[in-house]
């Protein structure tokens, strides 16, 4: 916000005093001239120069659900904290899901007005290599505490966490190639409760021109290889022991044209998407999904992946046409608009 004094010099400096007559100078002798009277400060200039936080108002409308998603936020204490109010309202102006949140570097508080519940998250760096974290659900009286220590080797850390008030602790070792977690859990076996050790982890490694990933969770292993260059991406994956396999294929024909295809060998389901961009702020997408037997096309005005504040007029618009394969007459045209105001 511009300072009013820079727009009108008369508000910044008082008018110069009128030159005294020679007679007055002789009579006053060595006495000082009285300072000029200060012009009265108007209420309007005071309001303009008041240091209030700037409000950011964002509203998004979805024609499919006929709902407005509204957010009002401002930064406090020289951008050290953020206060945000979010809520939804329908065409009858009925407000639902109101939430108020306060976020700072070390403490975050989210209050759900309808549920009358508060979620608290805190982070504290007690040492350059030691961090404490805590999560708490006030209504459920449940949470989690965690401690993460960075080891001497770069990229290595050890995290210990435990549910509150009861639960088995979990230990996670993080390293440059992935992470491994260990946690005890109870299993029922022949009407008896048995305690077992659960192992989850993920490993990533560069192989040739791609990345090989192994994800193990809940006694299921998923292997995935992602090859990517400037024009081609090929991503096969398989899950064990179910042997469910799939692959994704992406081909870039030019900087503005791209085709993506996905196929699942287990279910014979597939989907395809063609994308074309026109500059930075226009994107056309068309595709088909065999799982729901639906063809669709969408037009984005404004950067789809970017923030609304970087788009022209701080607004993004999406138009989408959905055409069911089994009933073309029931095709529907939808749109979504997102706009931001800085007050």
From Swiss-Prot:
Q: Where is this region: Disordered?
A: 1-43
Where would you say this protein principally sits, based on its record?
plastid
Describe, from its UniProt entry, the tissues in which this protein is expressed.
Ubiquitously expressed at low levels. Mostly present in cotyledons, and accumulates in seedlings and embryos.
**Could you list which ranges are Cytoplasmic topological domains?**
74-76, 114-129, 165-169, 229-230, 251-257, 280-286, 327-343
Q: Where are the transmembrane segments?
A: 77-86, 104-113, 130-137, 155-164, 170-178, 220-228, 231-240, 242-250, 258-267, 270-279, 287-296, 317-326
Assembly information from the UniProt record: Forms an hourglass-shaped multimeric complex.
Q: Which GO terms describe its molecular function?
A: identical protein binding; monoatomic ion channel activity; porin activity
Function recorded in the entry: Voltage-dependent peptide-sensitive high conductance rectifying cation channel with a strong affinity for TIC32 that is imported into the chloroplast. Conductance is pH-dependent decreasing with decreasing pH values.
Q: Composition bias, kind Polar residues: at what positions?
A: 1-11, 23-43
Note the InterPro entries from the entry: OEP37-like (IPR038951)
Show which residues sit on the Chloroplast intermembrane side of the membrane: 87-103, 138-154, 179-219, 241, 268-269, 297-316
The organism's lineage is:
Eukaryota, Viridiplantae, Streptophyta, Embryophyta, Tracheophyta
Judging by the UniProt lineage, the source's domain of life is Eukaryota
Q: Which UniProt keywords apply?
A: Chloroplast, Ion transport, Membrane, Plastid, Plastid outer membrane, Porin, Transit peptide, Transmembrane, Transmembrane beta strand, Transport
A single Gene Ontology biological process assigned to it is: monoatomic cation transport
Membrane-topology descriptor: Multi-pass membrane protein
Q: Which PANTHER family match?
A: OUTER ENVELOPE PORE PROTEIN 37, CHLOROPLASTIC (PTHR35484:SF2)
* Annotated protein name in UniProt: Outer envelope pore protein 37, chloroplastic
Q: Which family does it belong to?
A: Belongs to the plastid outer envelope porin OEP37 (TC 1.B.47) family.
Where in the cell does this protein reside? Plastid, Chloroplast outer membrane
Transit peptide limits: 1-73
Q: Name one GO cellular component term.
A: chloroplast
């Amino acid at each position: 916000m511009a300072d009013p004094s820079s727009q009108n010099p008369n508000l910044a400096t008082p008018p110069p005093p009128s030159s005294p007559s020679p007679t007055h100078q002789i009579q006053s002798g060595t006495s000082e001239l009285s300072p000029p009277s200060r012009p009265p400060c108007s209420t309007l200039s005071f309001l303009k120069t008041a240091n209030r936080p700037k409000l950011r108002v964002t509203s998004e409308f979805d024609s499919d659900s006929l709902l407005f998603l509204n957010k009002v936020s401002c930064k406090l204490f020289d951008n050290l904290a953020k206060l945000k109010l979010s809520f939804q309202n329908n065409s009858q102006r009925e407000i639902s899901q109101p939430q108020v949140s306060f976020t700072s570097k070390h403490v975050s508080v989210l209050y759900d007005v309808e549920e009358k519940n508060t979620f608290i998250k805190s982070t504290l760096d007690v040492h350059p290599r030691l961090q404490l974290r805590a999560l708490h659900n006030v209504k459920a009286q449940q949470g989690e505490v965690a401690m993460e220590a960075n080891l001497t080797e770069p990229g290595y850390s050890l995290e210990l966490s435990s549910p509150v008030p009861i639960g088995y602790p979990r230990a996670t070792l993080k390293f440059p190639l992935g992470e491994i977690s260990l946690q005890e859990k109870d299993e029922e076996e022949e009407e008896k409760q048995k305690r077992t050790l659960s192992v989850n982890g993920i490993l990533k490694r560069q192989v040739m021109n791609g990345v090989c990933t192994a994800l193990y969770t809940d006694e299921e292993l998923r292997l995935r290889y992602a090859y990517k260059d400037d024009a081609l991406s090929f991503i096969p994956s398989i899950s064990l022991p179910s042997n469910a396999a799939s692959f994704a294929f992406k081909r870039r024909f030019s900087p503005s044209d791209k085709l993506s295809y996905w196929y699942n060998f287990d279910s014979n389901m597939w989907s395809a998407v063609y994308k074309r961009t026109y500059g930075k702020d226009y994107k056309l997408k068309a595709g088909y999904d065999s799982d729901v037997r639906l063809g669709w096309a969408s037009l984005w005005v404004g950067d789809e992946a970017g923030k609304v504040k970087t788009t022209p007029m701080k607004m993004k618009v999406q138009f989408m046409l959905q055409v069911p394969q089994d009933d073309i007459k029931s095709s529907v045209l939808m749109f979504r608009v997102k706009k931001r105001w800085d007050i």
